[in-house]
From Swiss-Prot:
Pfam families for this protein: Alpha_L_fucos
Glycosylation sites: N119, N249, N296, N321, N352, N496, N511
Annotated S-S bridges: none
Predominant place of localization: secreted
Name of the molecule in the record: Putative alpha-L-fucosidase 1
Statement: the UniProt record of this protein carries the keyword Iron-sulfur: no
UniProtKB keywords: Apoplast, Glycoprotein, Glycosidase, Hydrolase, Secreted, Signal
SUPFAM superfamilies linked to this entry: (Trans)glycosidases, Galactose-binding domain-like
Domain of life: Eukaryota
Role description: Alpha-L-fucosidase is responsible for hydrolyzing the alpha-1,6-linked fucose joined to the reducing-end N-acetylglucosamine of the carbohydrate moieties of glycoproteins. Active only against 2'-fucosyl-lactitol when heterologously expressed.
InterPro entries linked to this entry: Galactose-bd-like_sf, Glyco_hydro_29, Glycoside_hydrolase_SF
Amino acid sequence: MATILLLLLGLLVGLPLLRAHGVTGSAAPTPPPLPVLPVPSYAQLQWQLSEMALFLHFGPNTFTDSEWGSVRADPAVFAPSALDAGQWARAAAAGGFGRVVLTAKHHDGFCLWPSALTNYSVAASPWKGGAGDVVGELAAAARAEGIGLGLYLSPWDRHEPVYGDTVAYNEHYLGQMTELLTRYGDVEEVWLDGAKGEGKDMDYMFDAWFALIHQLQQRVVIFSDAGPDTRWVGDEAGVAGYTCWSPFNKSTVTIGHIIPEYSRCGDPFGQDWVPAECDVSIRPGWFWHASEKPKNATTLLDIYYKSVGRNCLLILNVPPNSSGLISTEDMQVLQEFTEIRQTIFSQNFAANATVTASTVRGGLGNQQFAPSNVLQESIYSYWAPEEGQSSWEMLFDLGQSASFNVIQLQEPIQMGQRVIKFRVEILVDELWQTIVEGTTIGYKRLFQFPVVEGQFLKLSIDGARADPLISFFGVFTDSFSVTYSLENHEKPSVVNSSEVIMLRTDHSFGNKSIATM
């Protein structure tokens, strides 16, 4: 009996030590902080993670050298000689685009699938003897390449005779939408264009459309000027606002009637999660024209910085030509654009950095929310501070001096968008010098600036809707961009408004009560 009592006493005395060293699992883990509403749905989150989509404007306009087309265009003009939807899908997959979005019906009303509700479709064309189905071929090609399918169905239909009759046309439109969403498998995005020119007045029953789309495709996102799932950024240049919130009030705008600055910037007080989508064409027009040439790869890179790099999704239009292929010169630009991005973002100078932070949620030793989590490029692990702070700091020791001109920041947006104001500084000659100041971060924020060199960086967050959460911090070199390349070290005469260079100099090294992970 005495031996048993001694053993029990030893266990009781040793238990605190075992707990202190993590031998037992009895200590309760620290839960994640509460999300800050609104937050994305599953479909919205997957949409944002894909970063880019490839837009495909194709139809009779391709053959008639027009943009909005004509209701009088003979279906016989649609006669691609070498249409290869597989080429379109392969180009998208190779370029890092998460989905393809096809103009299944543009404003001219011509349908790229054999719709039973109109005689103005591929079924009336000579292509494949009237037995062709562009939507079907692209759906199969997208599945084969492991990318998603999106469909554009223009609300404005210049051909349909019942357009202008509220009940009849809404029934017609819902019928065509049902065909598209029940014949071709999963559809990840439905694109509703707000454009409308001349013609009859028409009241669209958008709520009924949205309900049907979500009913037929549970993981779809719907794009329009006003959502409900993703919004137009307000321009066709592919450029988002310097400040860009995903929170938004859908009731503030209507389809076809936007407030440009509100759409560009979003709303920190918005009640709805409606992230912005930036649309732009690789060519001057949306449809292919033999007389037009594509943008170059560095122009696309600049657009990438100002769209994906400002918390948006980039949808880049690359229109197939009249043969039914993406032109060789466009393919070359896409390849160069991809190679440039891979070169820039394949070497992160902060990948092996030592990271410290002013506080850590759950205590300095809590690995779950450790500062080092920001070195993993994933929104599902992140640094979180203790509650009750009003400003926050993270310090980065790169291990050795590096020259760089791009910084990437990310928030775990599944927890809501939080950061309102931040800055990044570099230690130069024992002085902290500000290299960038920013407002929002969101899913991804990319900053360009003239080349700097140093080993120690500091991220200071000066304002947030709630305790800030950071999921990634990266440091890169871009030697391709004309403005901020290694060959152009001098500060440009005109600095883009999204970059504020060397604003502040002081001797403060931040809070010394830091955690190192």
